[in-house]
Amino acid sequence: GLLPFAQMRVRASELLTTPLPAHRILLVENERCLHQLPQPTAQPLPSTIAVLGAGLNLGWLAAPWLQERTVAYWGDLDTWGLHMLAIARGHVPHLHALLMNAATFSAHQHLAVAEPVHAPDTVAGTWTPKEEALALRLRAQDKGRLEQEFLPAEAVHSALRAWADED
């Protein structure tokens, strides 16, 4: 592996100042999704490090070293996940959203639940037109929240492999 540890806990302030030794950085909103990521020994994603559990603590994405990396963001498919995606993309404009699209929501809509409170209006100009349309769709749904930890691992692995292969 790239690091001598399978897992480690790092402060956001450290991520701001210390470049991670990987070409690809995967940002995952929720650390409960660790079980869905490919195991390094079975299905490695070369030169990839996942940072899990930052939630709304996204200020570290202003780190200059991230501009030189291939970066993806995977969050809940709800207004809060899209809100965090917008904030993240405000720091890293070239960031790629994974599994945060209408096709993913439609394919797994049976797993969706009601979102008790919608996120505030988001950072203007950071969503793609399709993401903006998705946000409107999710707000209009009775069950407009698809939490990432309930997506099938196969769907996650497929999306990650496609992202890695683009690079």
Where are these regions (language model features)?
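Nucleic-acid enzyme cleavage-core boundary/entry regions
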Residues: G1-R69, W80, A86-A97, A103-D167
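Catalytic palm subdomain of template-directed nucleic-acid polymerases
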Residues: D76
